[in-house]
Amino acid sequence: MTIALGKFTKDEKDLFDIMDDWLRRDRFVFVGWSGLLLFPCAYFAVGGWFTGTTFVTSWYTHGLASSYLEGCNFLTAAVSTPANSLAHSLLLLWGPEAQGDFTRWCQLGGLWTFVALHGAFGLIGFMLRQFELARSVQLRPYNAIAFSGPIAVFVSVFLIYPLGQSGWFFAPSFGVAAIFRFILFFQGFHNWTLNPFHMMGVAGVLGAALLCAIHGATVENTLFEDGDGANTFRAFNPTQAEETYSMVTANRFWSQIFGVAFSNKRWLHFFILFVPVTGLWMSALGVVGLALNLRAYDFVSQEIRAAEDPEFETFYTKNILLNEGIRAWMAAQDQPHENLIFPEEVLPRGNAL
């Protein structure tokens, strides 16, 4: 019996090989297999958003004007979520709600589910693109792993949170002012700023900004040759012929500043990767908790004492009152379909307001 060792070669290329050759060809803009998911989804998501913000009203879903056509600007235009009565319907154009009528589909909020779902798959396609290119050029896939952070936040906020609530209605609409309203909603109804997962997210994002600034400045500092250039404005001249980067010099500098410093490039850069990605993932987990209506910290003893003693007040009790105000005034106008009417005596009052 003879065993042949060596690379297996096909006599002729099949359809997969032809597709693979074309998709992964070296060109100005790499396509790849991931591009089959990324490019159509990104095109439809961005195109749907521009269409919605330009032409489509939110009168039938939120009682609002939300398009340039109605007088909104870039900060106030939005692609709004469907009405609460539509619950978690995918709102397919050919579905039972719109029945193939494009105008009716837009009025019902179909563009929101269109943008949200294509946007989610577009982001996933972009992460797969980074995996594919890393594999092609023999890199480790840390870029793709890092990009899982933004994907986790997008999916948790725009998809998982409303799935835990009564409908897509409670997701953020796609617009600047709409996102601000959603943030106020999160604070008033979930006390989001006192949620430990939000705290970890803030620490991760702001900590990453600090680390990025420190790292960029340190590398810039050590890219220039020794000499009098360090003491004059010539130190800011970017035309030096070759870099003179020195990890040892940077380590010595920060050792003197803080008493401790990174001595290993890999650990340093992994830390700069780890801080923001972990922060984003923690935020995403927190939003999943909110989908299930899990509560933030409650300091009940302070609330009881504040209720009993008019002279006792903390920043926490003031914020709790403020949240009650947000709920009372926001719910009535934010959910007009509920016909909520709050009599004057139940509206919150106190020093916080």
Swiss-Prot record:
InterPro entries: D1/D2, Photo_II_D1/D2_sf, Photo_RC_L/M, Photo_RC_L/M_CS, PSII_PsbD/D2. It comes from the Eukaryota. GO terms for biological process: photosynthetic electron transport in photosystem II. A plastoquinone binds at H215, F262. Its EC number is 1.10.3.9. GO terms for cellular component: chloroplast thylakoid membrane; photosystem II. GO terms for molecular function: chlorophyll binding; electron transporter, transferring electrons within the cyclic electron transport pathway of photosynthesis activity; iron ion binding; oxygen evolving activity. Chlorophyll a ChlzD2 binds at H118. The D1/D2 heterodimer binds P680, chlorophylls that are the primary electron donor of PSII, and subsequent electron acceptors. It shares a non-heme iron and each subunit binds pheophytin, quinone, additional chlorophylls, carotenoids and lipids. There is also a Cl(-1) ion associated with D1 and D2, which is required for oxygen evolution. The PSII complex binds additional chlorophylls, carotenoids and specific lipids. Chlorophyll a PD2 binds at H198. Belongs to the reaction center PufL/M/PsbA/D family. This is Photosystem II D2 protein. The gene is psbD.
